[in-house]
């Protein structure tokens, strides 16, 4: 039972526990969407 529930929790929790990662992902997506040249968006 515990093993079956853990994987889903592991995938869902890190996003809430690590706001820095979510922020980086958001910033990366925003940069890529704003800048047509991905390599230079850095």
From Swiss-Prot:
Taxonomic placement: Eukaryota, Metazoa, Spiralia, Lophotrochozoa, Mollusca
Superkingdom of source: Eukaryota
Organism, scientific name: Conus monile (Necklace cone)
PTM annotation (D-tryptophan): residues: 37
Disulfide bonds, paired cysteine numbers: 35-41
Annotated family: Belongs to the O2 superfamily. Contryphan family.
Location in the cell: Secreted
Modified residues (Cysteine amide): 41
Further facts: Exists in two forms, due to cis-trans isomerization at 3-Cys-hydroxyPro-4. The cis conformation is the major form.
Disordered: annotated span: 1-24
MF-aspect GO terms: ion channel regulator activity; toxin activity
Protein name: Contryphan-Mo
């Amino acid at each position: 039972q515990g093993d079956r529930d853990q994987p889903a929790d592991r995938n869902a929790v890190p996003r809430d526990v690590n706001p820095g990662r979510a922020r980086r992902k958001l910033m990366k997506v925003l940069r890529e969407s704003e800048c047509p040249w991905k390599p230079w968006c850095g």
